[in-house]
From Swiss-Prot:
<keyword id="KW-0129">CBS domain</keyword>
<keyword id="KW-0812">Transmembrane</keyword>
<feature type="transmembrane region" description="Helical; Name=4">
    <location>
        <begin position="250"/>
        <end position="270"/>
    </location>
</feature>
<keyword id="KW-1133">Transmembrane helix</keyword>
<feature type="region of interest" description="Disordered">
    <location>
        <begin position="553"/>
        <end position="584"/>
    </location>
</feature>
<dbReference type="InterPro" id="IPR046342">
    <property type="entry name" value="CBS_dom_sf"/>
</dbReference>
<feature type="region of interest" description="Disordered">
    <location>
        <begin position="79"/>
        <end position="98"/>
    </location>
</feature>
<dbReference type="GO" id="GO:0009507">
    <property type="term" value="C:chloroplast"/>
</dbReference>
<dbReference type="InterPro" id="IPR050368">
    <property type="entry name" value="ClC-type_chloride_channel"/>
</dbReference>
<dbReference type="Pfam" id="PF00654">
    <property type="entry name" value="Voltage_CLC"/>
</dbReference>
<dbReference type="InterPro" id="IPR001807">
    <property type="entry name" value="ClC"/>
</dbReference>
<feature type="transmembrane region" description="Helical; Name=6">
    <location>
        <begin position="314"/>
        <end position="334"/>
    </location>
</feature>
<comment type="function">
    <text>Voltage-gated chloride channel.</text>
</comment>
<keyword id="KW-0813">Transport</keyword>
<comment type="similarity">
    <text>Belongs to the chloride channel (TC 2.A.49) family.</text>
</comment>
<feature type="transmembrane region" description="Helical; Name=3">
    <location>
        <begin position="221"/>
        <end position="241"/>
    </location>
</feature>
<feature type="domain" description="CBS 1">
    <location>
        <begin position="621"/>
        <end position="677"/>
    </location>
</feature>
Length: 781
């Protein structure tokens, strides 16, 4: 930590540590680290917009700057190219101080020595007020794009099903099959063919992009074309009636808007997560006209799986602003009506609560069947492609054909907006509404058709199908329960109408299928605006979430360690967790909305950067360090250093709080500057010699520390940027305001990071190999 080696010592140009003031350590949350000198960026600009953000940042940004791995490597290479001899001397001098505890110069010294301009090194993310403004812009952009997407779906639907009334499925069910079979069968197949052809186009664009990756400068226009094509695929899928929903694509549109703004700036991982969360919230808010549910959706699918404590403190404000603005824009363009009309219903008594709990478990069981069907269909289509050598574009056509065949018997499985859901919600109140027995068949058919469409590669979401399946299951359960109880107790009217159970079933199925319990509860509450439904709703949702976790517990135990985020809780693809790429083409086209189906990309969790971003400092730090009290003499400290073979000693005060750090370099500088005698060593306390504070850019700051819940990637970048090899780990939150002291927990060694990284990569590679062997044995090919 202290610098070593010979030469004149300048206290203002050494040992960048900071724990004082508002800049106490790293790890997000309270007291984010100050990394004012940590963002050298040797990257090409991407046009006037990015330059504007950079200019704003240089003038106003005071915090939140990080150094990426690739930038550090670029700077190191450029330094060696500019002055190889100085670089070698610099490294040698750094090793002189007891095993290379730190380098001789601070970052500012290196900038001067190697000719780096401070304006270049100041390049980083915009300030908080600018990001809040960007959150508003994301809301506007997402609202406009989602409205355009919905208009496109309606245009395609009206053209494909011309002459069919708005009630669609109910009308088709009442017609003679001989008059309608060709349309029911051929229209979804046509949609599948178009989607499959566009899959082929995406593969061509992916190959072009990879071939030009080495020559790419500035903005990647192919990356902007990709989400547009995906939105068109989703519009065609839904417009031709295939059994999926529009909310997943709406969320993807919001995420794409956020990615577009993120690519215009130099952003760290946490700010990308914040922008993605704002995009996800705006997508679901504009899709459902439910701003509150959009906020909770972002929290559940983005912030929760990616450690919300590492996100910037203004993330929640960004999410709320984006959600409200996108919902407002969507209202202005599409109207203020809700996604579907909630019928009148009545909750009879609290004695029905056990029935709602049973319904929750039933919905959970349905979601388990559905998720396994999706996996089975996906693997089946992959097997067919490999076995018969079929191109990937054929699979969506087969999915459309399967949906059409099912629709010949049950036309209610076709996507027709939310008219099918409204028809179910009016069971018993409308002559055209299906009966209980037909609803049971329709629920089963919808599960199979949706899993088939999703597994075949058709593009769409699961929210709308989940709501329809849940409504059907709830209506069947409520109607059956009422009939059984009325037969057992004649004249008893203590059971609510099927509409109440249908509403609760919708939320429970949605929560279980997509792992969004809070979003489901808030969404239904926003739609019904009835507080009475919350108690049965929350009970049913809780059990609906519990059933899949129990059912999948055995299956996940073998593979959970092989996935960096765990089952079903991440809204970001592995490639998006890195600081570099956000454009990735995958065959299964999972959207943000689909959180329960496992992402098949297992290569990213073996990536060095991904592992470092997933690991916490507490797993790598060492608790085997030497500490002495501040009253220990310098002679005693020197003997302890020699006997313990340590490079540094942690100095603590009488209350065992971190007071400073003592290195061989500190001792040599004290002895040379003070011409001290043996008597001085025997009487001088280490508190007078150790490093306690540093002056950096005209400000006096304390020791540089980190928190145990910080990511190893952030700590590594900080150590590289500040030229230190050890970093004290202190307890978060226990700040003694008088002196701002911290409780010492451990010591993070730079060399230990690489040792742990090698071991972790080996462990994950072994898990991945076992998983692949198991899959081969299961699939039989």
């Amino acid at each position: 930590m202290s610098s070593g080696g010979a030469g004149e010592y300048n206290e203002d140009r050494h040992l960048l540590r900071s724990t004082d003031g508002d800049e106490v350590g790293i790890g997000g949350g309270e007291g984010d680290l100050d990394v004012e000198s940590q963002s050298p960026a040797i990257r090409s600009g991407a046009g006037g917009v990015r330059d504007l953000f950079k200019h704003i940042d240089r003038r106003f940004s005071l915090s939140g700057r990080r150094l990426s791995f690739k930038r550090m490597e670029n700077i190191r290479v450029d330094r060696e190219r500019h002055n190889p001899s100085s670089s070698s001397a610099f490294s040698a001098a750094g090793e002189e101080d007891g095993g290379g505890i730190s380098n001789l110069h601070s970052v500012d010294d290196r900038n001067d020595e190697y000719g780096f301009d401070e304006e270049v090194l100041g390049d980083s993310a915009p300030p908080e007020w600018a990001l809040l403004l960007i959150g508003c812009l994301i809301g506007v952009a997402a609202g406009i794009c989602v409205a355009g997407f919905n208009k496109g779906v309606h245009v395609i639907h009206e053209w494909a099903w011309a002459g069919t009334p708005n009630e669609g499925a109910a009308w088709l069910r009442l017609q003679r099959l001989a008059d309608t079979w060709h349309r029911i069968l051929l229209i979804p197949v046509t949609g599948g063919v178009i989607v499959g052809m566009m899959h082929g186009l995406l593969e061509i664009l992916d190959q072009i992009r990879q071939s030009n990756s080495s020559q790419r400068q500035g903005l990647d226009f192919l990356a902007g074309i990709y989400p547009v094509i995906k939105a068109i695929q989703a519009a065609v899928t839904l417009g031709t009636g295939c059994s999926l929903g529009p909310e997943g694509p709406s969320v993807d549109i919001g995420k794409s808007c956020a990615n577009g703004f993120a690519l215009m700036m130099e952003n760290n991982r946490e700010r990308r997560i914040a922008l993605t969360a704002a995009g996800a919230a705006s997508g679901i808010a504009s899709g459902f006209n439910a701003a509150v549910a959009g906020c909770f959706f972002a929290i559940e699918t983005v912030l929760r799986p990616l450690r919300a404590e590492n996100s910037p403190p203004f993330t929640t404000a960004m999410i709320i602003l984006a959600s409200v603005i996108s919902s407002t824009v969507s209202n202005a363009l599409l109207g203020t009506q809700s996604a579907f009309t909630v019928p009148s219903y009545d909750l009879k008594s609290a004695a029905e609560l056990p029935l709602y709990l049973i319904l929750g478990m039933l919905c959970g069981a349905v979601s388990v069947v559905f998720s396994r069907l999706v996996t089975w269909f996906t693997k089946s289509f992959d097997f067919i492609k490999d076995k018969f050598g079929l191109p990937a574009i054929v699979c969506p056509a087969l999915g459309g054909l399967g949906a059409g065949i099912i629709a010949l018997k049950y036309p209610g499985i076709l996507y027709w907006g939310f008219t099918n859901v409204e028809e179910i919600l009016h069971t018993g109140k409308s002559a055209s509404a299906p009966g209980i027995w037909l609803l049971a068949q329709l629920a089963a058919a919808k599960v199979v058709a949706t899993a088939l469409c999703k597994g075949s590669g058709l593009v769409g979401g699961l929210y709308a199908p989940s709501l329809m399946i849940g409504a059907a299951v709830g209506a069947v359960f409520g109607g059956s329960a009422a009939e059984i109880i009325n037969r057992a107790i004649p004249g008893n009217a203590a059971v609510a109408q099927p509409q109440a159970y249908a509403l609760v079933g919708m939320a429970a199925t949605l929560a279980s299928m997509c792992s969004v319990p809070l979003t489901s509860v808030l969404l239904l509450f926003e739609l019904t605006k009835d507080y009475r439904i919350l108690l049965p709703l929350m009970g049913a949702v809780g059990l609906a979430i519990w059933v899949p976790s129990v059912a999948n517990q055995g299956k996940e135990s073998d593979s959970s360690e092989g996935r960096s985020t765990g089952r079903g809780y991440s809204s970001l693809s592995p490639s998006e967790r890195k600081t570099e790429g956000v454009w990735r083409h995958t065959d299964n086209a999972d959207s943000l909305e689909l959180t329960v189906i496992e992402n098949p990309d297992h290569n990213s969790f073996l990536d060095e950067e991904t592992i470092l971003e997933d690991l916490k400092v507490m797993r790598v730090m060492s608790k085997n360090y030497v500490k002495v009290s501040s009253g220990t003499t310098l002679r005693e400290a020197r003997n302890i250093l020699k006997e313990s073979h340590q490079n540094c000693i942690m100095v603590v005060d009488d209350d065992d709080f971190l007071a400073g750090i003592l290195t061989h370099g500190d001792i040599r500088r004290y002895l040379s500057n003070n011409a001290s005698t043996i008597l001085d060593e025997n009487t001088c306390p280490v508190s007078s010699v150790c490093t306690k504070k540093i002056s950096y850019r005209g400000q006096e700051r304390g020791l540089l520390t980190c928190y145990p819940d910080a990511t190893v990637g952030v700590a590594k970048e900080l150590m590289e940027a500040r030229g230190v090899k050890q970093l004290p780990v202190v307890k978060r939150g226990e700040v003694i305001h008088k002196g701002k002291r911290r409780k010492l927990l451990g010591l993070l060694h730079y060399d230990s990071i690489w040792t742990f990284l090698r071991d972790e990569m080996s462990r994950r590679r072994s898990i991945n190999d076992r998983r692949k062997d198991k899959e081969v044995g299961t699939n039989g090919h």
